[in-house]
Design a protein with these regions (language model features):
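Export/targeting segments at the very N-terminus of extracytoplasmic proteins
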Residues: 2-57
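Charged phosphate-binding loop/patch that engages nucleotide di/tri-phosphates or the phosphate backbone
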Residues: 14-16, 27, 116-129
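Stable alpha-helical elements in mature extracytoplasmic
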Residues: 29, 33, 43-47, 74-78, ...
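Glycine/charged-rich beta-loop-alpha catalytic/anionic-binding loops adjacent to active sites
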Residues: 31-34, 87-91
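Sec-exported extracytoplasmic/periplasmic mature domains
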Residues: 38, 42, 46, 52-56, ...
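Short, solvent-exposed loop/turn and secondary-structure capping segments
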Residues: 61-64
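Substrate-binding/active-site groove segments that recognize
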Residues: 68-90
Length: 129
């Protein structure tokens, strides 16, 4: 009886495997979103570190609006993707930078294309990891 209970608890409190499993409340909660982002980027953990430094694992604010950069309001979402420079390409790829899935997916694309360069402004935070 204890072993099945452990599996139930693990599946309940582990990071969601599917983005659709995240509710708005889950996306607004940095702990829940942080677990999801770390699982999502398990093969490229530097991207999870960057997400922490860029947005403190926040995609939506408490008001439900997308998190925007303090220095540059064109930076959006958990990965702080700049819409001025990247929205057209993201749209061509069928990605919405304001959606969690689109923001995470586009960050993967950027990382594969340019490495960590797009996030160099926050490198003092994640560069030592």
């Amino acid at each position: 009886m204890i072993i099945p209970l452990i599996f139930i608890l693990a599946s309940t409190f582990g990071a969601p495997q599917d983005i659709s499993a995240l509710t708005v409340e889950g996306i607004q909660n940095p702990e829940t979103l942080g677990a999801y982002v770390r699982e999502y980027y398990k093969d490229t953990p530097i991207l999870a570190d960057i997400a922490w430094c860029e947005s403190r694992m926040r995609h939506l604010g408490k008001d439900g609006d997308i998190v925007r950069g303090v220095v540059n309001s064109k930076d959006v979402g958990v990965m702080q993707i700049n819409t001025r420079f990247h929205e057209a390409t993201a749209t061509e790829m069928g990605l919405d930078l304001k959606s969690l899935q689109g923001n995470l997916k586009y960050a993967e694309y950027l990382y594969e294309k340019e490495g960590t360069k797009p996030w160099n402004s926050s490198k003092p935070c994640w560069g030592s990891k």
